[in-house]
């Protein structure tokens, strides 16, 4: 398909990304997710995007900021004695789902913001013990100081150790123990509610050798077992990576996706289905003495000019308002080519990109997020999704499809694109479908099998009752993955519908719940949301008029969509069992 590029739009997007390439240092760091009316009382918490999937406001009577494990024990003990509900919050709060929320208004937020220190680094044993509030960026830096490296991790370094453990965060690999951070942990110190004789709080020391059952429950805990205080990582000697991006057509992608991860240790893909293209990441481990001082400073994670971000968001809103699919496809083509040309932010020496392969040390290549690493500038610049500006606002559907089903799943998506080639340009405006490899994990709530994780980011309206252009196509993809191929949702991402009945997909769920009942019999660290996703009480879906528009439910009648705006509940186009909000011609002419 050939698109005509409007000069004004081309210039706008081009200037935006030229600025991004040049601008790497000055930015306003994200706000604290916890806000209180007076001191540390009468508080609310949100995520870094400023809205949870159901757009609710999460409240608590107080927030505590312990600075040591002893202070953490005191906080948990006092709340346990008082029978108060507790949830843990982090410095940046990047989980989309409501994992930070406690019930009602009388609960307690426990922030790990100041629990961010290295406890011990042992270069000989190749282990490092850190506090749970340490960010991934800090962990990478501290490990490198003693010549060590974490082999696999998420690409965004603004996550905390506790946050990664709580949600099962991962990078991309089928090699070794796989790409999940929690599978490179050897010991966890956790503070849980205790009995009267224990002073109402108990420090639990968990490891794969001494307490394997409890350890496997705590590795991905959703925060319902207590507060992780410290984590000990099993690290590796520093190594280098050699990375090359290649863009190809997607004609044989179904087959390549199944085998590519066995050939390259850190392989991943960025799929652009409406363009019929795939960006292959050929990324392999090389010896530490290999020449090269490369750096990966991912362009979308750099600081952005707030005014430019606002213009881009306004443009996307206008395209939605006037159903301008061509405009979205033009923008997607420009953005994907503009990101690919400078290698997504790779440089051969930390300054410029001169060509492939880019070789650099693991600590310089594995993760980035320079928009966090900055001074205050009055929001002239910010991370692109900062909720204080008119920036990116999106849904994120992130699902791990078993590797044995990936070929069929990709074929189904291609079948949808054949029906309407423009249907997925909107997600390509958000860089395309990121696909990362994961393996089975001994963690009870970790991945069940080798899989490919499909990370799909797409437009979200500020008005929850506003339908999206071609939303039925993305809804069908979501339901194909979840129900036809039994995909697992990422615990920290996704819309509500992904979590109904999800606990039945985990073979070790009963073992996890048994540990939960032992550690916190009164459910003080549980919430309505965790009870729903763990299958204890209620459902994650919220059924009401318009609920399917934001993934709060799967539509079963027209009222769950937007009938007044021409969107009715209809079967899927490829997967007939799907129920999606489809715009029906003749109902209404414009949104």
Swiss-Prot record:
**Domain FAD-binding PCMH-type: start-end pairs:** 56-238
The identity of this protein, by name, is L-gulonolactone oxidase 2
In UniProt terms, what function does this protein have?
A: Catalyzes the oxidation of L-gulono-1,4-lactone to ascorbic acid. L-gulono-1,4-lactone is oxidized to hydrogen peroxide and L-xylo-hexulonolactone which spontaneously isomerizes to L-ascorbate.
Q: What is the lineage of its organism?
A: Eukaryota, Viridiplantae, Streptophyta, Embryophyta, Tracheophyta
Reaction catalysis annotation: L-gulono-1,4-lactone + O2 = L-ascorbate + H2O2 + H(+)
The main enzyme category here is oxidoreductase
Cofactor(s) needed for function: FAD
Report which superkingdom the organism of origin falls in: Eukaryota
Q: Name one GO cellular component term.
A: membrane
Can you name the source organism? Arabidopsis thaliana
Please state which protein family the record places this protein in.
Answer: Belongs to the oxygen-dependent FAD-linked oxidoreductase family.
Keyword Calcium belongs to the record: no
What start and end residues bound the annotated signal peptide? 1-27
Name the InterPro entries for this protein. Answer: ALO_C, FAD-bd_PCMH, FAD-bd_PCMH-like_sf, FAD-bd_PCMH_sub1, FAD-bd_PCMH_sub2, FAD-linked_Oxidoreductases_BP, GULLO2-like_C, GULO_Plant
Name the pathway.
Cofactor biosynthesis; L-ascorbate biosynthesis
